[in-house]
Every structure is written in structure tokens, then in C-alpha cells.
Regions:
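Bacterial N-terminal signal peptides that target proteins for export
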Residues: 1-13
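Hydrophobic h-region of N-terminal signal peptides that target proteins for export
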Residues: 12-23
Length: 443
């Protein structure tokens, strides 16, 4: 059911004073410089990736990766950057998490090194591999998690790699360390691990640090790593990545949380607005376009909200700033995909995709069954009028976008397991599996 607070208000009717959500990282049309792509929405607007592939078709190259990581590869020019965690040394006595409610966790039996990789986009060759840190993790995370789940971000001159409790690192494109910063030790809910990626806007790098102790949001000078500001957050563990949007010429950092979804002034860290309504265990990252922010969660209760930024000040819970809210189709692990006027969401274990009118919150038909898809951690991506959904067991189902009833266009299988989200650039699709990095391109 959709709850409308402004009747038949259409976002398109917002006048020239409307907020425009701008991409945080300025890259070329063939780049994927951050976690959810050039627009931060999961869409590559000018890309034309392949429709069909298999282990024997349309694989330009396939590179075996060391260690394990669920970070999405990022692409700038002819280089791909990604992170991984590599176990080393003899096994130690297992150390199980001690967090309250811990379940389904990995036992800690090995030291790890935390590594940034650069890969040739043309050949798949690993160009360099730099170890940033080594330790025996204090928390290993959920059995399905990795110790390198935060995706890097780049402006083309610097690569920012975040390993949470193991540090934040800034490198040049050739792997030279420019600066590093230790933000402390994170203690996550149930010991399920860390996952929020940094966000970059202009000269400022943003890191959200929500955990079971003193949570905070911090802004850093991207050139030096020096803190510009740090603000406390009265929140428990979350795994979502912040986004940065422009409002009336001023960028805001949008961060979801169990207690409040908040917009912070990028310049000062001051809270501009906040809104209640999400659930606990915030994993999905928000998306934004045309002056509206969309955020959702569905761990214990389900909620999907659309927030109009024009006029948003203070506590906007239950006000006309909440254009619409709904319970059906709320995301959990995969983040929403915002493609044109359609907002796509997935529940990670159901094999069902919902399509919502971004203007009204009403269903655009569906939800639609993805017959080939079961469990999904990767967020869906869109390009060339298609939606790509990749399951954990290596199946990518492709469906059409922009049609009243979407067509299921292809089912593609690879011999790997996938939790990282896809990256799209030009005519190529990049899939990062548990063992391999694939470049998928028409032969």
C-alpha cells in the first residue's frame, strides 16, 4: 500500500528551484568510478553491454584474483581497481565473535593482508598489487561476508580504498601510497562485519562509521586525509554507503540509519533534515535524482521512502516532504536501481523484482518473478534499456526496461559465485566473483 502525503503531486511539477541530484564523481562516459556507477543510481547511461554470455561466449578475459572480496570493481580509463583480503600464515586457534546475538559467523583462524589491485581493462593482467595492512581480524563477519566489502572510489588522480577497522588509504593510479588514516576499531551488530563504502564529492571524502559503540560521520580532505569535520551519529550498525546530492547549490550527504534518515551539510556536517521510518539493519544504499532521495530497508519491518529535498529542514517525519512511503517492495541487501522514472528493488532471497513509479510510489505492474534467480546480494544495474540481476550462484538474468510488462531477455551462467555488484563501462560488463574477475564483451 502507498501512503501519499501530497495527493497527486508529481515530482516533474517541481519548479526551477528544485534540487538536482548530481553525481559525486566526475568521470567519463566509459567510467564506473564509484560503488553505484557514474550517477550513483546503478545506471550507466551511455553504455551498451552484451546481452548474452557464458564461460564459452563473450568473455574477453577472465582473471583469477587472490584472496576474497565483495567490493565492486571501479573503472577509470584503462584501469580497474578493486580490493581483496588474503589469508596467510599458519592457522591459529579459532576465535569466535563475542557480540550479543552473534550467529552464522566465521571463525577467526588466519591472519590477513588487505590489498588493493589494479587490473588492465584491455587484457585483464594484474598491473600492481599493494598490501595496505596485515592483522588477525577482531571480527570476521557473517559466513557469507568478506573482509574487503567496501568498494573503492576514484577521481582519476587518486584511488581511495577503505578497509574499515584496517584503515583508509589513498593511492595514486600507479599504486603509490599518498596518505593513510586509522579511524579506529569497529564493533558491528552480531559481529557480522563491515561494508559501507566511502563517498567522494569535489575535494571531500566521506566515511560513515555506524557500529555498536560511538558512531560518527567524518569528512576528510581528499588530498591530505586531514579531517574537515566529524559529527556523532546516534545510530547502531549500518552497512549502507552514503551518497552526496546537490540542493540549491549546496551539497548534502545523505545517510540512512535505523533511527533516522538524515541529510548533512557537506561543508559543516550540520544536520539539515532528518526523517524516521526505516527499520534496523540498514544495508541498502539510498539513490537520488531530480531533487528526491529514495531510501529503504526491510529487515524486521519494511519501508521505502521518497523525500523531497526542496524545503526539507529539521524533522520532516510525517510531513509533505515525504512525497510517498510504502511497505511493499522494500529492499534489504541489494540497493535500489533508479532508472528513469522507475525504481527497482529486490528482496535478496525471493527471486522477485519490484518496479515502482518514482514519482508516485505506485507499482508499475508486478512485482515480477525472476525464474532463474534465487539468492541475490549484488545490486541490480541498468544500461541500454536493460536491467541486469546477478545471483550468488552465478546466474545473471537480463530483463527489459521501459516496457509496461518487462520481457525476460536472457539468462547467463558463469562458473563462480557472486556477491559484488556489477560494473558497466562502454560496451563491457565487469563481474567480480569469489575467484575471478570477468570482462564480458561482444566477440
Amino acid at each position: 500500500m502507498v501512503h501519499s502525503f501530497v495527493g497527486r503531486l508529481l515530482i516533474a511539477s517541481v519548479l526551477c528551484g528544485a534540487v538536482l541530484a548530481e553525481r559525486s564523481v566526475a568521470g567519463g562516459q566509459d567510467d564506473w568510478p564509484q560503488w553505484r556507477g557514474p550517477l550513483g543510481t546503478g545506471v550507466a547511461p551511455r553504455a551498451r553491454p552484451p546481452l548474452k554470455w557464458s564461460e564459452n561466449k563473450n568473455i574477453r578475459w577472465k582473471t583469477e584474483l587472490p584472496g576474497k572480496g565483495h567490493s565492486t570493481p571501479i573503472i577509470w580509463g584503462e584501469r580497474i581497481f578493486l580490493t581483496t583480503a588474503i589469508p596467510y600464515g599458519p592457522a591459529v586457534k579459532p576465535r569466535l565473535p563475542s557480540r550479543p546475538g552473534a550467529h552464522d559467523n566465521l571463525a577467526l583462524t588466519h591472519h590477513h593482508e588487505y590489498v588493493v589491485l589494479a587490473v588492465s581493462r584491455k587484457t585483464g593482467k594484474i598491473l600492481w598489487q599493494q598490501t595496505m595492512h596485515k592483522d588477525l581480524p577482531h571480527e570476521a563477519g557473517h559466513v557469507t561476508a568478506s573482509l574487503a566489502s567496501a568498494s573503492p572510489v576514484t577521481d582519476g588522480e587518486r584511488v581511495f580504498a577503505f578497509f574499515g577497522s584496517r584503515g583508509l588509504y589513498c593511492l595514486d593510479p600507479n599504486g603509490k601510497l599518498l596518505w593513510k588514516k586509522n579511524l579506529g576499531e569497529m564493533h558491528t551488530k552480531h559481529g557480522h562485519g563491515e561494508g559501507s563504502s566511502p563517498a567522494l564529492h569535489g575535494e571531500t571524502l566521506i566515511v560513515n562509521w555506524d557500529h555498536e559503540e560511538e558512531s560518527f560521520l567524518v569528512a576528510l580532505d581528499k588530498r591530505t586525509g586531514k579531517e574537515r569535520w566529524r559529527v556523532a551519529r546516534p545510530e547502531d550498525t549500518s552497512w549502507a554507503t552514503p551518497i552526496v546530492v546537490e540542493h540549491a547549490g549546496k551539497p548534502q550527504v545523505i545517510v540512512p540509519g535505523t533511527k533516522r534518515l538524515r541529510g548533512y551539510d557537506l561543508a559543516s556536517g550540520a544536520v539539515v533534515w532528518e526523517c524516521a521510518g526505516l527499520s534496523s539493519n540498514i544495508v541498502a544504499s539510498p539513490v537520488a535524482a531530480n531533487g528526491v532521495v529514495y531510501a529503504g530497508s526491510s529487515y524486521d519491518t519494511r519501508a521505502l521512502l521518497a523525500i523531497r529535498l526542496d524545503g526539507a529542514k529539521g524533522d520532516i517525519t510525517g510531513t509533505k516532504q515525504v512525497i510517498w512511503s510504502r511497505e511493499r517492495g522494500a529492499p534489504y541487501v541489494p540497493s535500489p536501481l533508479l532508472y528513469g522514472d522507475s525504481l527497482y528493488t529486490l528482496r535478496h532471497y525471493q527471486g522477485v523484482i519490484s518496479r515502482v513509479d518514482a514519482k508516485t510510489g505506485n507499482d508499475q505492474g508486478g512485482p515480477f518473478r525472476l525464474d532463474a534467480i534465487d539468492n541475490v546480494y549484488a545490486s541490480p544495474v541498468g544500461a541500454d534499456g536493460r536491467i541486469y540481476v546477478t545471483s550468488r550462484d552465478g546466474i545473471t538474468q537480463v530483463m527489459s526496461h521501459g516496457e509496461r510488462i518487462p520481457r525476460m531477455l536472457a539468462v547467463n551462467r558463469l562458473d563462480d559465485h557472486f556477491s559484488a555488484s556489477a560494473a558497466i563501462a562502454g560496451r563491457e560488463l565487469f563481474l567480480r566473483g569469489e575467484r575471478y574477475l570477468y570482462c564480458i564483451a561482444e566477440e
